[in-house]
Amino acid sequence: LSVDAAEVYYESAGQNWERAAMIKARPIAGDLESGSAFMKGLRPFVWRRSLDFNAIQDIQSIKRQIDRKQGREPPSAFGHNVKLGRGGIREIEFYAQTQQLIWGGRDASLRDCGTLPALAALVRAGHVAANVQADLETAYRKLRTIEHRLQMVDDRQTHMTPEADEAYGFARFAGYE
């Protein structure tokens, strides 16, 4: 697929979930200059100056699909998915990206690929309350720390907190008393 063909695809048939995914996209290897040019070409696709109600409904539909797949059980200390579960990492990222898609077409200062910098920019622009951003940042940092500790325990990618019989040892390992 050529760069031109990819740009035509996104302009003519790109989906809203792809717009959200492209918020975090950036060139990291290979021809960085060409990668940057490609990302620049996608800006009109990702950062629309106006967002219609169908796009907002589509974004909400994506969230509902995630919720159905994961279930909507209240978070539990035991056996909870810190990444995809209720109140998890992806919910915070999804919130930030949705706000970016809503406001970022008219305000380039909101187009950061990082979740925490994006939330801070949304506060500066007056779109997110400072206390909401502070709570989300605290939760995001704690969840990421727990995620990393979970992965260190078994030396594999996992996002599930341990069941009750292993929880105490993990909590101590993660720095909790």
For each predicted feature, which ranges?
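A nucleotide- and high-energy phosphate-metabolite-utilizing enzyme signature
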Residues: 1-177
